[in-house]
Amino acid sequence: MLRIGSRCVRSVPKSSLRVSSTKIGKLFVRSVSDKPEEVFTKLSDENDPQRDAFFKYSWGTWLKNDKQEKEKRITKFSLEGLNSVIDDLYKQSIENAKRLSKSSIPPPAYLPNLTVSLPHNVKIENIGTVNPNEKIRIVSMASIHEGKHHRIYKIDTNAEKSFVLRIPYALDDENTLAYRLKSEVATMDFADLKLGLKVPKVYSFGVNALNPVRQPFILEEYIEGTLLMRSWTPLENDAEDGKSHKDKLNAVINPISKFQAKLAEVKFNAFGSLYFAKDYKTSEESAYEGETNEELKDRWRIGPSVERCLWRKKSTLNFDDRKQYLGPWDISSPLDIVKCTGLLEAENARARLGLVQAHASPEVVAEDILKDQIKTFDNLAKVAPDLINTKTTSIPKMENLLKPRLHHPDLDPMNVILKEDDDVPYLLDFEGSSIKPYILQNTPQFVAYDGPKIYDLEKDIEGYKDMEESEKAKLEFMYKRTRNQFLWEFALNENLPELISSVAPPIKVLRNPYVAAIERKSDEEYLLIEEALLQLAEVWPIFANNKLVNAAEYPLKYSEEEVKKHADALNAYHEKLISQPFAATQGWMPQDMFDNLVQGGILVKNEKGDYVISRTEDA
């Protein structure tokens, strides 16, 4: 989910492809060297077998079903088709120079080849030029990142201009990918033109495999620089001066907090996600009020939300059946977002259960887990209407917390690059962005912490000085996580003081079930949602007395047997996370670590072709 310069890639090998109009060349071979092994290929040879390795996933291995997981992440595309798209951009830039003023912002151009270009970005000053008799061509490519959801290539041309090509993995159905790409580009466009944020310029995109690239893609500006993550040291020890460690941490926190503040500036007319007007013709309503720039007035619309939880692994459901849960939602009904999230997940679990019971499921999942998921998500939907009293006066400036604001799901130092020449931060990868009330927007993952809070080790922990070093280390970890979150919330108060109530402890407890739902990564994590619902039940009477919720009694009833069953299941899940390496990442591990564990005999292949910990290692 980031785009980085080759110098910013962590110490892993990169694949590099040199393209020739005359030679057949080589493709990369994975190597421990930081220098890529070059491979040459002929541009017109679409069937060159040497290219195959260039498109295969190589940054990690799954302990189970590795072959199938990697096949889903093959990003084979047409080099010749990509070259034609880039060449056409240069032709467009010449025409744009003739017909557009420097400040002109025309609508996106929907082209016959089923790509879309953004004319205000496709300018000679942005993409360069070649000699009049010379045709633009790709001269080399490098794979610079293999992320969770897409792969990123750096494309170099004979115009001495580099581009970034982003290709999503085929993990979802075509409709999901199309909606996701349309919204992502429109959101980046909005962030650039309306908010003035530093983001990569998008030149062209295609939402399906019918375009010349033969893959959904985004072609955007390449920014040379250093990832902000390089400066993030979350376990930094407190300095003796009591200040310099905060300065170091805030050097990362503050730029991201300022991005968040800019994203929250505009109050929208509905909840959902942004699209270009032509990509969402269902609505004629402007995305927001008060626009004075005529070229921006009808540029964007609010359509179905592309928040990841609403689309991820939902292909079991018919797309038309899914759409009823995706919004857009009226500005007067913010809690419908929570309700629809629960209803959609419950319906998806029912559909999956039906396939399992009919012995037609392509996945291995226990019936009991799916049945419990259905119950949990139905519970979330049932609680939703009463979850927050939107008229309460107990929370200061509640009306501000309920207004529709842009939410970026990956505010993270891994998603920010400091430009090489001036260290200006650029925010990357807007995939999954949505518009929802700030009261439902969770703390960014890099600073989020929901464990025991320790603000001062010696004052808060009795006998801390006399403890064993191992016990001190655990408490110091909690302290540093608490400290980092506090620094984030302090920055929030500096940059968005009208929204500081969003991090009040009661608000966090109220939104915890929803946050657990949108952050769920595995089937068993429904237990975290149920745990949040049970915790909410304990404090509901207090919240009701203070008019924070809409019902005097908690909408859910739990028997002692149900509470015990849940506690046992949650404990078993936590034990699994401890006893099974990489359970939290669904069995995925970085490739260099996997190679070392196999070479050391710690991981061995079983009769099914999966990798397990060696029995001798257990002994």
Swiss-Prot record:
Keywords for the protein's UniProt record, in alphabetical order: Mitochondrion, Transit peptide
Signal peptide positions on this chain: none
Domain of life, source organism: Eukaryota
Keyword Mitochondrion: yes
Residue span of the annotated presequence: 1-31
InterPro entries cross-referenced by the UniProt entry: Kinase-like_dom_sf (IPR011009), Mito_inheritance_9 (IPR051035)
Location in the cell: Mitochondrion
One GO cellular component term noted in the UniProt record for this chain: mitochondrion
Family that this chain belongs to: Belongs to the AIM9 family.
Record-given protein name: Altered inheritance of mitochondria protein 9, mitochondrial
Species annotation: Kluyveromyces lactis (strain ATCC 8585 / CBS 2359 / DSM 70799 / NBRC 1267 / NRRL Y-1140 / WM37)
Lineage: Eukaryota, Fungi, Dikarya, Ascomycota, Saccharomycotina
